[in-house]
UniProtKB/Swiss-Prot annotation:
<dbReference type="GO" id="GO:0016592">
    <property type="term" value="C:mediator complex"/>
</dbReference>
<dbReference type="InterPro" id="IPR008626">
    <property type="entry name" value="Mediator_Med15_fun"/>
</dbReference>
<feature type="compositionally biased region" description="Low complexity">
    <location>
        <begin position="375"/>
        <end position="398"/>
    </location>
</feature>
<comment type="similarity">
    <text>Belongs to the Mediator complex subunit 15 family.</text>
</comment>
<feature type="region of interest" description="Disordered">
    <location>
        <begin position="702"/>
        <end position="791"/>
    </location>
</feature>
<feature type="compositionally biased region" description="Polar residues">
    <location>
        <begin position="235"/>
        <end position="244"/>
    </location>
</feature>
<feature type="region of interest" description="Disordered">
    <location>
        <begin position="372"/>
        <end position="398"/>
    </location>
</feature>
<dbReference type="InterPro" id="IPR033789">
    <property type="entry name" value="Gal11_coact"/>
</dbReference>
<dbReference type="Pfam" id="PF05397">
    <property type="entry name" value="Med15_fungi"/>
</dbReference>
<keyword id="KW-0804">Transcription</keyword>
<feature type="region of interest" description="Disordered">
    <location>
        <begin position="1233"/>
        <end position="1270"/>
    </location>
</feature>
<keyword id="KW-0010">Activator</keyword>
<feature type="compositionally biased region" description="Polar residues">
    <location>
        <begin position="555"/>
        <end position="587"/>
    </location>
</feature>
<dbReference type="GO" id="GO:0003712">
    <property type="term" value="F:transcription coregulator activity"/>
</dbReference>
<feature type="compositionally biased region" description="Low complexity">
    <location>
        <begin position="245"/>
        <end position="283"/>
    </location>
</feature>
<dbReference type="InterPro" id="IPR036529">
    <property type="entry name" value="KIX_dom_sf"/>
</dbReference>
<feature type="compositionally biased region" description="Low complexity">
    <location>
        <begin position="588"/>
        <end position="624"/>
    </location>
</feature>
């Protein structure tokens, strides 16, 4: 959704907003700076652009982006207007203070006179010729304005003085001649005595008697003096506006204050004729001081008045807020009172109904009434304990918000938790932009605010769950009340008085009534507890809102925020699942072991709900297995069974399936509930169990006595029938069961019908017991996934190799992390160690479920990253921050949850099909049994028990026989598949042998075909009958996170084997090698070579041999490539070095003909100034050999073998390359020793012997030479087989000698001429 709204916003609109913001910022800085405003428009644009990009990234929709941008522009515009208004007010005040009086006062006249004398002074000096050069030009160390006599820091240069206004010029002139106060003058260091004006200070600066630091201090003091002068002028202007009477009063006050206080001593004044006027009367100074004091007093009075007004306004605001709070509190109190009244009314109604029912029950069953009283007393005691706990909380703890973060995993799923975290993060950013939170927050502060937000969410979710529980409890209580009323009305009929002899037997039927009353009392307790919890939470929320304004801002903004995650809006409709989830341990409960006491009432409520559910289940289980009571009429026993059937809880199929799969620890729900019950409820359960056991014993004794006195059979009551375990069978045949359970009062007197009904009931019971025995072990069918085929295994190996080809390159950030972060990473890895280590087990499962290669590739990449993190962390090295570890664990959990969900769905499908089959079989068996029962009832009614027993045994045998037949069919199919696969393997082996014979295979082989066939035969014989041969390939799937071993085998395979489609392991490996050649790197890595399968593998020798051949081939190709690059301008060395490899000559035992360039040597050895790039370094690491140059010798060693590997081939193979060259057939006659060379004339008809040339190992296998023969050296291969042109050119002049300065171009042209080599 974010991409959609961002795509609708064009760049032109964004740039328009940026320019508007920048323009407003420029206007504000111009208003604040005035004519001397100095700002950079580009910087302002960058600032506006940064704000816009942050808003663009954090906004979740276009509306929010536009709204925030408009608000920001409006706020800045209002700020601009406000600053402009303030500037206008200040300008108006300054005009009033500096307004020129119509007549000049004596002080202004003196100032003008001093200014005129100062202007005439430099003119006299210039006319007399006495002007010193120091005065003519500014000093180097003194600023220009100081050199010209202007005070430092504030005055401008002479060029800008013409632009100043009249008021500013007058102010500057006054500052020149004004006397510096003693307090300010003392702050300037290095001032000699007698200096009292700024003119004298400037002269000192011109004479370089003041340092730069002294000048800086002088500038600051000058500014302070200037401010004092401005204030004094403002005070004088205010005095001028006063009436003469007010002036007289002020003078009297000043005189009185001067008399009471000693006047400070005046600083000595040194009058100079050039700067200060000759006469300064003291009266004027006194008047100025008086005026200044008056102005200060007026300012103080004005400030005090303003402060008083502000205080009054604040008090009014506080009073208004208090009134609003009081109103809100009153409203809340009224609402609480209304709720309490409603609750009291409901409780009164319930109490009346209970009293009425209790009175009726007491008349008939005093024992049951006593039990009820005991349970009610115990529940009341438990309720009092729950009420006392919140009262004992301190006042400080009651004000805190209850910490319910430990319930986070019980309320929200991991996806919802992630969405909550993201929403909280965005909310904090929005509040920062809105100015409700500080602009800069540390990570801990940000996490604290996010936790507060999540805590609010969990609290609201729990409140919703409590409300749902209240609604469900109210509905249940209403149903139980209606049932009790119906039962009471049906039970206390006039006709019931006739059956007083069965009063003791009716006691068992009243257990339903006791249960309903117990559940009613429990629901009442729950309702009261929930009300108290809500009241406590409301009071705590109010107190926290008064104390923590930021917390209330978070809560208010959350209530206004719309969440994008759809899962947060789903209310939990099942309260029982919440109770089950609370039993599971959570990570947050471990991180917050100290729970707040504010949530104790809520926990007690949840525990009591669990206890009530467990108690109901216990009573129902006891009712489902009652002792056989004495026979009695069916109408009496039918009524107490109805509430039992209605109160039976529906099972949860999903929870059962999860327990069957073993994905969650199998713990019975009853044991969990009993473990979490409070003590009062446990006591009540124990008492009820004891009483019920006593009643059962009494009833058994009564039944035995009655059966002895009453020999004739009677109809058993319906309450004896136990409920069948499989609910599907019960749902499939409701009509039959109901028809069998319906009473027939008209035919009760007939003994034959009674016997037939009794037989039917016994038969049903026995059938149900047998079905339980058959179905219980089969209710948990194993999840059978389709076996991975050979193609699937190849795909998985290919994906694994592709992922392994791109290794991770993470830097070491151990020094950048804090100890807390390091410990956090270790704790996370240790907590999720089982999840991280079990990834390999469900990678094939993920592919078989999804058939998506991209998902498997992503999971393998995550596995590689997790493995690197764990390996480095075990060594104390950290390569990723903690948030990356969180992301890896979250992705693992996401994949695991997806696989678990898919497996559950598959299990449900298998379970449903199995149930349908069983239901059909049961229905058929019941129909056949009913037909036989009818025949037996008509033909032989005297011995029904024997026939029913035989029928049951026959049915059981049939069921078992059907299961055995199914198992035999499955085994036969598996055996057939194994035989077919073995036949395919034998056919493939035969084809392979034929193709190997046709492909000119060499005679010598390291492992003959017969040996391969014997190994194949033994492996096929060892395979189990019920297993598929393809399962042997499953061992190649990586289980330890490493790359598979057999991926990099690159041996050449005949084309016939590639076309074969059998599941032979050898053929499969060769097919894999042939298909993976163009896709994999030619040089295997050390990890591929070092690792080998740990299990017993009959093909381990072949695999190692093939791997060794692949490495050898890669090294040969790498050596040739290096030589091709280094000997680019020396093909002679290229040919000779390659021939030396074929003959088994070591690298350092021969010398090159042409020297290797120095640049090339530095590049190969890595000693040059130019460093390797990342790509070059990666190529060097992936290379299979190590290459370096030493003493103009190219040395190349293998990375995979410590010893020097020999690349020699047989001499016959070398000589076969030169068969057509003058009839040579043996390579031993060649000599490459240039030291014993003879003149070419004597060497034409001679053949040299080389006895020590047999360097290649004699045990080398010629069948392995196909690889070296198929290597394409960049040379004209056709010239080996033809002898034309160059070979026939016998008149060619022999070269001088390659070791004595022969030209390389000439040698390259005649390299393939045999005469050329003979001339050496």
């Amino acid at each position: 959704m974010e991409l959609d709204w961002r795509s609708t916003l064009s760049n032109q609109e964004r740039s328009k907003y940026i320019t508007e913001l920048a323009q407003i910022l420029a206007d504000i800085s111009q208003i604040n700076g005035g004519a001397r405003a100095n700002f950079d428009l580009e910087k302002l644009k960058k600032t506006a652009e940064q704000f816009e990009t942050s808003l663009y990234a954090s906004s979740s929709s276009k509306e929010l982006y536009l709204d925030a941008m408009r608000k920001r522009i409006a706020a800045m515009d209002a700020a601009k207007k406000k600053t402009l208004a303030n500037q206008k007010q200040k300008a108006a005040a300054q005009r009033k203070g500096f307004g020129l009086a119509p007549t000049l006062n004596p002080q202004m006249f003196l100032n003008q006179q001093a200014q005129a004398r100062q202007q005439a002074r430099p003119m006299r000096g210039s006319v007399g010729g006495g002007q010193s050069p120091v005065m003519m030009m500014p000093q180097h160390g003194v600023p220009a304005h100081v050199a010209h006599g202007v005070p430092p820091g504030v005055a401008v240069s002479q060029a800008k003085r013409a632009q100043l206004s009249l008021q500013q010029q007058q102010q500057i002139n006054e500052m020149k001649v004004a006397e510096i106060p003693r307090e300010l003058l003392q702050r300037i260091p290095n001032i000699p005595p007698g200096v009292t004006t700024w003119q004298q200070v400037t002269e000192l600066a011109q004479q370089k008697r003041l340092t730069q630091s002294d000048l800086q201090i002088a500038k600051q003091v000058y500014q302070m003096h200037q401010q004092m002068m401005v204030k004094s002028k403002m005070q004088q202007a205010s005095l001028n506006q006063l009436t003469p009477q007010q002036r007289a009063q002020l003078q009297q006050r000043q005189q009185s204050t001067q008399q009471s206080q000693s006047a400070p001593p005046q600083a000595p004044q040194v009058a100079q004729s050039q700067q200060v006027p000759a006469q300064k009367p003291q009266q004027q100074q006194q008047q100025q001081q008086q005026q200044q004091q008056q102005q200060q007093q007026q300012q103080q009075q004005q400030q005090q008045q303003q402060q008083q007004q502000q205080q009054q306004q604040q008090q009014q605001q506080q009073q208004q807020q208090q009134q609003q709070q009081q109103q809100q509190q009153q409203q809340q109190q009224q609402q609480q009172q209304q709720q309490q009244q409603q609750q009291q009314q409901q409780q009164q109604q319930q109490q009346q109904q209970q009293q009425h029912a209790a009175a009726q029950a007491q008349l008939q069953h005093p024992n049951a009434y006593q039990q009820k009283n005991m349970m009610a007393q115990q529940s009341a005691a438990a309720l009092q304990q729950g009420q006392q706990q919140p009262r004992q909380m301190g006042p400080q703890q009651a004000r805190e918000v209850p910490n319910v973060l430990n319930k986070l995993n019980q309320v929200f799923s991991p996806a919802e938790q992630k969405a909550l975290y993201e929403n909280g993060k965005k909310l904090v950013q929005d509040l920062q932009l809105a100015g409700k939170l500080p602009a800069s927050l540390t990570q801990q502060q940000q996490i604290l605010y996010i936790k507060k937000y999540i805590n609010q969410m969990v609290l609201k979710k729990l409140q919703q769950n409590i409300r749902l529980a209240q609604q469900i409890g109210a509905a249940n209580s209403a149903n139980t009340q209606s049932q009790m009323a119906a039962q009471a009305g049906a039970r206390f009929t006039p006709g019931m008085a006739q059956h007083s002899q069965f009063a003791q037997q009716q006691h068992t039927g009243n257990q339903a009534q006791v249960q309903s009353q117990v559940s009613q009392s429990i629901s009442q307790q729950q309702a009261q507890l929930t009300q108290k919890v809500q009241q406590a939470q409301q009071s705590q929320l109010q107190q926290t809102q008064e104390q923590d304004p930021q917390h209330t801002q978070l809560a208010d903004s959350f209530s206004q925020r719309q969440f994008t995650s759809p899962t947060l809006a789903k209310p939990s409709a099942n309260v029982s699942t919440i109770a089950q989830q609370q039993t599971q341990p959570t990570a947050l409960s471990q991180s917050h072991p100290q729970q707040q006491q504010g949530s104790q009432a809520q926990q007690q409520l949840l525990q009591q709900q669990q206890g009530s559910q467990a108690q109901q289940q216990l009573l129902q289980q006891q009712q489902q297995q009652p002792p056989p009571p004495p026979p009695q009429p069916q109408q009496q026993t039918q009524q107490p069974q109805q509430p039992q059937q209605q109160q039976q809880p529906q099972p949860q199929p999903q929870l059962q399936q999860q327990q069957q799969l073993g994905l969650q620890p199998h713990q019975p729900q009853l044991a969990q509930a009993q473990a979490q019950q409070p003590q009062p409820q446990q006591q009540t359960q124990q008492q009820t169990q004891q009483q019920q056991q006593q009643q059962q014993q009494q009833q058994q004794q009564q039944t035995q006595q009655q059966t002895q006195h009453q020999p004739q059979p009677q109809l058993k009551p319906q309450s004896q029938q136990p409920q069948p375990v499989p609910q599907q069978v019960q749902s499939q045949q409701p009509q039959q069961v109901q028809s069998q359970q319906q009473p027939q009062p008209q035919q009760l007197s007939q003994p034959a019908q009674q016997q037939s009904q009794q037989q039917q009931q016994q038969q049903q019971q026995s059938q149900q017991q047998k079905l339980r025995q058959v179905q219980l072990p089969q209710q948990t069918p194993k999840i059978t996934l389709p076996r991975p085929t050979e193609q699937d295994m190849m795909i998985l190996k290919r994906i694994n190799s592709e992922v392994a080809k791109s290794p991770l390159r993470l830097s070491n950030i151990t020094n950048q992390l804090t100890p807390e972060q390091k410990q956090m990473i270790k704790n996370k890895l240790q907590a999720n160690q089982q999840l991280l280590s079990n990834v390999d087990n469900f990678i094939p499962t993920l592919y078989l479920i999804t058939r998506n290669e991209e998902n498997v590739r992503q999971l393998l990449q995550i596995r590689m990253l997790a493995k690197e993190i764990m390996e480095h962390a075990s060594k104390g090295v950290f390569i990723v921050p903690p948030d990356v570890v969180d992301k890896v664990i979250f992705r693992y959990q996401k994949y695991y949850e997806f696989i678990k969900e898919q497996l559950l769905r598959r299990h449900q499908q298998l379970f449903s099909t199995r149930q349908q089959q069983m239901q059909q079989q049961v229905v058929q068996q019941q129909q056949a049994g009913q037909i036989k029962l009818g025949q037996n009832a008509v033909g032989a009614p005297q011995n029904p028990q024997v026939t029913t027993n035989t029928d049951i045994a026959m049915q059981q045998q049939r069921v078992q026989g059907s299961f055995q037949q199914m198992q035999q069919q499955i085994r036969q199919q598996q055996v057939k598949q194994a035989q077919l696969q073995q036949a395919q393997q034998q056919a493939q082996q035969q084809q392979q042998a034929q193709q190997l014979q046709q492909g000119h295979m060499p005679v010598q082989q390291s492992m003959p075909l017969a040996g391969v066939q014997t190994v194949m035969a033994t492996q096929a014989a060892t395979l189990p009958q019920h297993a598929s041969p393809v399962s042997s390939n499953t061992a190649n799937i990586p289980k330890t996170g490493d790359a598979p071993v057999s991926i990099d085998s690159v041996t050449p395979v005949p084309p016939g084997i590639v076309n074969s489609s059998g599941p032979s392991p050898v053929a499969g490996k060769q097919i894999l090698a042939a298909t993976m050649v163009p896709q994999h790197k030619l040089s295997p890595t050390k990890s591929d070579f070092a690792q080998a399968p740990t299990a017993d593998n009959p093909y381990q020798v072949d695999e190692l041999r093939l791997k060794n051949l692949a490495i050898r081939k890669a090294e040969i190709m790498s050596r040739f490539k290096h030589r091709q690059e280094i000997f680019e301008h020396s093909p002679v060395d290229l040919f000779l070095c390659t021939l030396a490899d074929c003959m088994g000559i070591k690298d350092g035992s021969y010398e090159l003909l042409a020297p290797i360039p120095a640049l090339m040597v530095e590049q190969i050895n890595g000693t040059g100034k130019k460093k390797f790039t990342k790509a070059q370094q990666r190529v060097r690491e992936q290379d299979s050999i190590e290459c370096y140059v030493k003493d103009n010798k190219l040395m190349m060693s293998s990375k995979f073998s410590a010893d020097e590997r020999s690349y020699s081939i047989h001499d016959r193979d070398i000589s076969s390359c030169f068969l057509d060259l003058y009839g040579l057939s043996d390579c031993t006659s060649l000599s490459f020793d240039s030291s014993s060379a003879e003149p070419p004339t004597e060497q034409v008809n001679k053949k040299r012997s080389h006895d020590s040339l047999e360097i290649s190992p004699a045990e080398s296998d010629s069948s392995l030479l196909n690889d070296s023969k198929k290597l394409k050296v960049d040379s004209p291969d056709d010239l080996f087989m033809t002898s034309n042109m160059m070979l026939d050119n016998k008149n060619a002049q022999p070269p001088i000698g390659l070791g004595l300065g022969v030209g390389l171009g000439e040698a390259g042209s005649s390299i393939w001429n045999w005469n050329y080599w003979e001339s050496l």
